[in-house]
């Protein structure tokens, strides 16, 4: 699959960002529910990527029309790509309601990623990243994409 220079730069930036956070451990394990607008401040661009009949993954809005998720989320358990018509991104999900819902038009896993079920080795995990293109952009003041570097550091 060919990817353009912009998407390549986004993938490279995302890999660098992920590499900087690999190994970091949470200071506490208590999860805080996001019930109010104030609770969810700063988290609005995080959403749930629903995969009809197959579960869900977490994803983050990184451009008005692009989300970032794990590459293993876009593959079936046999390693074949999941049909993008089965995906739905629900941005700003709070108490079961999303602020924006979009279908997916294209999924691009990292070019070096090779599907391996339950992979835990660092080289495989480092490439477990994918950029998905939304069918329509999300242009809402409250749902601002996370800022990522325009190119690798």
Where are these regions (language model features)?
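Generic detector of contiguous secondary-structure segments
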Residues: 49-56, 91-95, 151
